[in-house]
Amino acid sequence: MDPDNAAKYFSNAKSARDNVDSLVSEVNSILDPMRDKKFVVFHDAYQYFERAFGISASGAISLGDASDPSPARIAEIRKRVVDEAVECVLAEPQFNQGTVKAVIEGTKANTTVIDPLGVKLEPGPSLYENLIRNLATNLAKCF
């Protein structure tokens, strides 16, 4: 297709692969101390992240992002937080923080905001890396 630029394409691909490998190593180091700890996410949007880095949420407050969780759902997750000694419940900036407060009230669980949209991140070539790094860093801070 474009043999004149083949060397540049291969170089760019190698650089991107090296950056991803480095990011994976960094994120694994960030997450290592909390691998066996229990956490709950606001909504079930992190399955690929969890699978890629060998972690697993104990549950999600909301089963989707289109509507607020019902009182029954909040009670169910709250019971799970208590029964499983969940240490962290993740909030998201675009959702009602009061819901997370209702889930953790009276428990020993901590909470922190995790931003899967990267709203406050600077657009540019490092956006994806920064987004993944921030997810890991903010999750680890919760413990």
What do the predicted segments below correspond to?
Residues 1-143:
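Extracytoplasmic metal-acquisition and chelation regions
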